Curated annotation (Swiss-Prot):
Protein known as: Translation initiation factor IF-3
GO molecular function ontology, one term from the record: ribosome binding
Lineage: Bacteria, Pseudomonadati, Pseudomonadota, Gammaproteobacteria, Enterobacterales
Keyword list, A-Z: Cytoplasm, Initiation factor, Protein biosynthesis
The protein's assembly and partners: Monomer.
One protein family per Pfam: IF3_N
Length: 180
């Protein structure tokens, strides 16, 4: 259906004529207290200043209202929330797969990758996979995991260390150490 009624989204704060209280505790443009005044008087002061009257805390007795530019207030609020989102880092779990017979050169390459993941603040999941007859030599797998753990002890904390084999693999999870 074209041209249907648009549902108006509810604002988090009541402004101007939406305020229901008879009297309000008023705060000025610069944050100064102007005392308890009637709603009509508060609306007049806001209109004089050419800005809006915004209800900040409706549950207070009397409700606290502030004289401010509501559009600018919303802009600043969204800008600060975007800044906070930028600063948050999503921790990912990166996986590296080893085998009991992983050669020295491959081991060093995989170790460098693990170091990079941990320095970036991500967790690292080390999966040690057994094939065929390798299942008979589980102690070799444990030696590989212990070697990784010892090589990364300055950078990482072991979150989970395998005590037994799960299926045909052992899994160890490392988390980066907190920076002081």
């Amino acid at each position: 259906m074209k041209g249907g009624k648009r549902v108006q989204t509810a604002r988090p704060n009541r402004i101007n004529s939406e305020i229901r209280a008879q009297e309000v505790r008023l705060t000025g443009l610069e944050g100064e207290q102007l005392g308890i005044v009637s709603l009509r008087e508060a609306l007049e002061k806001a209109e004089e200043a050419g800005v809006d009257l915004v209800e900040i805390s409706p549950n207070a007795e009397p409700p606290v209202c502030r004289i401010m530019d509501y559009g600018k207030f919303l802009y600043e609020k969204s800008k600060s929330s975007k800044e906070q989102k930028k600063k948050q880092k999503v921790i990912q779990v990166k996986e590296i797969k080893f085998r009991p017979g992983t050669d020295e050169g491959d081991y060093q390459v995989k170790l460098r990758s693990l170091i990079r993941f941990l320095e970036e603040g991500d967790k690292a999941k080390i999966t040690l996979r057994f094939r065929g007859r390798e299942m008979a030599h589980q102690q070799i797998g444990m030696e590989v995991l212990n070697r990784v753990k010892n090589d990364l002890q300055e950078l990482a904390v072991v979150e989970s260390f395998p005590t037994k084999i799960e299926g045909r693999q052992m899994i160890m999870v490392l988390a980066p150490k907190k920076k002081q």
